[in-house]
């Protein structure tokens, strides 16, 4: 059997969207190497609902 890889799929969710009170949510799916980055990802991505770049954090 082949062993499991180090690269896993993670979901990033906007942190500023909940506080704004606007309906909907902004989520992105990406991959990360769990050996190189064991902690949660925090990336600035575009939020199409708020129409600006916001911080997206990994959820699980």
Curated annotation (Swiss-Prot):
GO terms for biological process: translation. The keyword Ribosomal protein applies. Gene3D superfamilies: Ribosomal protein L33. Pfam families: Ribosomal_L33. One of its GO terms (cellular component) is ribonucleoprotein complex. SUPFAM superfamilies: Zn-binding ribosomal proteins. The keyword Cytoplasm does not apply. Belongs to the bacterial ribosomal protein bL33 family. This is Large ribosomal subunit protein bL33. It comes from Flavobacterium psychrophilum (strain ATCC 49511 / DSM 21280 / CIP 103535 / JIP02/86). The gene is rpmG.
């Amino acid at each position: 059997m082949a062993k499991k890889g180090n690269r896993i799929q993670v979901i990033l969710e906007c942190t500023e969207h909940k506080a704004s009170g606007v309906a909907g949510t902004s989520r992105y799916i990406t991959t990360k190497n769990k050996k190189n980055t064991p902690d949660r990802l925090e990336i600035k991505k575009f939020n199409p609902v708020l129409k600006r770049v916001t911080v997206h954090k990994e959820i699980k």
